[in-house]
Amino acid sequence: MATPAKKTGSKKSKRNVPNGVVHIQSTFNNTIVSITDTNGEVISWSSAGASGFKGARKGTPFAAQTAAEAAARRALDQGMRQIEVLVRGPGSGRETAIRALQVAGLEITLIRDVTPLPHNGCRRAKRRRV
């Protein structure tokens, strides 16, 4: 029987990135955490869905915490120590994700809310009737 061929794909090299920017996009349905270097190159990312949560549980604060921990762990492996945090969106996982980054061992130097606010742009969605 033939032996399976070894995969020789290009493996991403581990860079030493001491400081970066964490983008937290928190919606009502999911939380996405992307960690970039200062130029905007993505170093690690995670989301509530990628962390194993499905459906309505993706929008919970605990799911946001788990996603932030996973992204922070991968960033720490690449040598990241100091971060700036940019938070976008109205979701429930905003504060929990920031707290999880701090507990993971990253030093937060700045927290900024960059939620886009319309100057009376598009019409809002109709109100839900349950």
Curated annotation (Swiss-Prot):
The keyword Transmembrane helix does not apply. GO terms for biological process: translation. Gene3D superfamilies: Ribosomal protein S11. It comes from the Bacteria. GO terms for cellular component: ribonucleoprotein complex; ribosome. GO terms for molecular function: rRNA binding; structural constituent of ribosome. Keywords: Ribonucleoprotein, Ribosomal protein, RNA-binding, rRNA-binding. Belongs to the universal ribosomal protein uS11 family. Part of the 30S ribosomal subunit. Interacts with proteins S7 and S18. Binds to IF-3. NCBIfam families: PRK05309.1, uS11_bact. Located on the platform of the 30S subunit, it bridges several disparate RNA helices of the 16S rRNA. Forms part of the Shine-Dalgarno cleft in the 70S ribosome. This is Small ribosomal subunit protein uS11. It comes from Prochlorococcus marinus (strain SARG / CCMP1375 / SS120).
